[in-house]
Amino acid sequence: MSITKTYNGDPTSLVPTQSVKESLRLIEDLKFFLATAPANWQENQVIRRYYLNHDEGFVSCVYWNNLYFITGTDIVRCIVYKFEHFGRKIIDRKKFEEGIFSDLRNLKCGADAILEPPRSEFLEFLFKNSCLRTQKKQKVFFWFNVPHDKLMADALERDLKKEKMGQRPTTMAHREPALSFHYDESSSLYTQLGKHMETQKRINDAATSSTSNTATTLTDTGVSSGLNNTTSGGGSDSATSTHNNNEASTKPSNGSEKSSPEYTTTARGRDEFGFLNEATPSQYKANSDYEDDFPLDYINQTTQNSEDYITLDANYQAGSYANMIEDNYDSFLDATLFIPPSLGVPTGTAATATTSNQVAFNDEYLIEQAQPIRTPLPPISSSTISGLLQPKSAAKFFSLQSANGGEEFFPAYQNDPSTANAGFVPPISAKYATQFATRQVATPTYIKAIPQTGAAAATGNGGQPQQYYDQATGNAFYPAEIPVSYNVVHPESEYWTNNSGAVATTAAATAPMYDASGFPIPINQSYMVMNEHEMVPYQYMNSNGAMIGMIPPHQQQQQQQQQIAMGYQSMLRQQQQQQQQQQQQQPSSTMTKKKKQIHSFNNNKSLSSNGGGITKKSHDNNNHSKVKTSYGSLNDVVNSKVTKVINKEEVKQSQT
């Protein structure tokens, strides 16, 4: 009977108590993270996360511009997580979040948060790290300015008041400790919630101690040899267990009733607060696979284990392959691999220099893609280029040569007839595994043709062969036909040669721009815009419309066109000025004529009154004898001397 009294119930009755204890422990862990997340960060750490569950994900503490931030989305996640472990199930998530965001409006910008513009760099960083659901303009809160417990208490108070009023709440109690919580409107819900959480913790601690005492009693019973000893031992253990439970129930709390439950739920002595200086408390590290932090949060510079951490460096290369090479890649390849034998240090014999490793390279490959050739190929003469070793499109390699001797790439072994270079095989093309020509340069120079009219597209102007015009030198030449026809306008990804030294010689060995019977290919040329059709110096439209046939104009023709255009514009200006002067002079000329008539009448009258005599003929008579002359053109009117003289006389008379 003593065993039954000591056990005090069946094992199934302790399962809900264990779940409540686990829920309270998870709430304590989250509160501890919210209180100590900005402490003990690594050197390059920018974010620290706490995993909630599969539905809510992570809560992140972000370090940005020397400050620690938390988003409103993460605040809602924390409150939802606490409600679930408190025993209340969320039935209307949208209304629940609206109430929390309404409370967050009390946290003002500047004092408790910052206002970020839409799609800013900070919001983009938060969005990529799943701290936000959108990049709209919003507030991001300072880490220590968010009252998490007060926000949870306000959300719970809204639901409890709705339940009393008969309205539909956003959450519903479905298990402990929410089922045993009774709301008293006369006191603060914040204080009531703290008391209730502390009471639940004491009850679970008592149940845990009772379970441990029962297990000890059962063990002692199996070891003892007599039933009396077992019964007496069980009675003593039962008495001890009862005494411990009474002490646990009457033990006073270290925190006050008005303090936050974040600090009152865990009762610790003053000597037990050394964990605040540690990265992780020792009680959480014991008997668990606890890691230092989330692996994506920072760069671990002490170890080279790339499986544990993901670096923020864009140029980082994981694996042992990248770590064994220096930053400048000097230790990856031998530097003497790319040095010709003639420039290397002689070792006493020419054979040693000849057998050094050769490198195949050309313009199509980077230096990192160059590969050494293990077996040097024998020299190939230029007479065998039309054989089977060369592709058909490679015939132009040897038909175009440069006048500078090809000293850009191989100055050592081509012009030096020494014994060291006597047996050296020239580098070969990595694309065709064939040799370069002796005087070849791999710099392309494009040859552009002068477009002709459609009727003379085959033979050029006047039955002459097709002309080609080099824009670099300004020379025209006539190409010769060779067996290999090649399209110069659309070259393949192969070599071209430089024809700066000998334009005519190069063009003579080049394939034509297009066949005589083929369709002409238009070439991009600069357009000449003419506003007036009379000023076009030559016919510029083609009959067939396939291409524009224009000969490159000479400098004298361009100067003549410019002079004609300038003369035409000046003539228009003179006409406009002359018309304006005539309009202004019409009213003034009528006034001067009237004044002249009055003046002449007064003179004649005064002479007749004086008794007559010989008088001088007045100049006014000339005005009556004027003859209006008609000029043939506007230039005659402008350059007329008669008009200028008459105007001068009228001005003098008007002044007198």
Curated annotation (Swiss-Prot):
Single Gene Ontology BP annotation: regulation of DNA-templated transcription
Biased composition (Basic and acidic residues): 646-656
Effect of mutating residue 482 to M: In strain: 1006
Superkingdom as given in the UniProt entry: Eukaryota
Residue spans of biased composition, Low complexity class: 205-242, 575-586, 600-609
DNA-binding region: 44-154
UniProt KW Coiled coil keyword: no
GO molecular function, one term: DNA-binding transcription factor activity
Function per UniProt: Transcription factor involved in the formation of pseudohyphae and hyphae. It is likely to play a role in the developmental switch between yeast and mycelial forms. May be involved in a signal transduction system, strengthening the possibility of a sexual phase up to now undetected, and similar to that of the yeast mating pathway.
Main location: nucleus
Biased composition annotated in UniProt, kind: Polar residues: 243-267, 628-642
Annotated organism of origin: Candida albicans (strain SC5314 / ATCC MYA-2876)
Keywords in alphabetical order: Activator, DNA-binding, Nucleus, Transcription, Transcription regulation
InterPro entries: Ste12, STE12_transcription_factor
Location of region: Disordered: 205-289, 575-656
Single GO cellular component term: Tec1p-Ste12p-Dig1p complex
Family: Belongs to the STE12 transcription factor family.
Name of the protein in question: Transcription factor CPH1
Pfam families the UniProt entry points to: STE
Gene (name only): CPH1
Cellular location(s): Nucleus
